[in-house]
């Protein structure tokens, strides 16, 4: 019997995400027929309702034999998440687990010992707190809202926001790396809108401390695949801000640093990841300051992805494109980021980005 080296792991898969490009090539290497639902890049929103979603599945002959690969887009779609969990196999973590862990206040209190803590929360507005909608993602539905339903108020923690990206196999974790997260500057409607990330170094002592906590967390909730945790450091305490038991934006940083990352996420292999380089990586998502019609000037920008079509109308506060950076030196990459944003703002009416860096 001869092994077919071109046979792929899955016959059919459905990718659900806001921004498909960073996952597309990796997934098509292992899937014969890939279907994509991406509200950011498709005219029709197939996640508008469960009925619309079911019609999309029927039209494309997508049934329970199709594997679901989830990144984003279902944060407030409870009925679609429940339907997918019941009828399909979800690569990585199921959507019930995603919903549970997306709210850190659902976590077992025994995880929060010593200097790993959660910000205080309140049901009432307080000027030192920020408003957050349950299952918020990417800085959306986070701000200073006093009158919306389905929100809570979280103690504001000053300082930079970081994240740790890791793989889990239900028992233990492998830390991929640590990142600083960036946000859009001077956006009144979305003051905490996520706008990119940059990889960081961490010494061995700190690495072991984080790994012990993440191993306990991963084992307790039997996590699978690519996950990330957003946090802040203040007064010698680590404040857990958000937990993402799913593919997230920092995947684009580590797909360049490790070999076959998507294979590990969907469970095709359980071995240790092989690092292919030790460079620093970063990316910046540019958001439209006003409605913007794409023209040829964007092609003057270097190393861009998630590129819109010429003539496409980008609505205010929606992503336009992504700038990508790499360097062998952590100081040089920050300079590249600053220069890249400056160049982009000369030709695109986009928001600036907060780049506080320690």
Specify the residue positions occupied by each region the protein language model found.
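A conserved helix-loop-beta module that forms one wall/lid of the active-site cleft
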Residues: 85-146
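Conserved metal-phosphate-binding beta-hairpin within the catalytic cores
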Residues: 218-252, 290
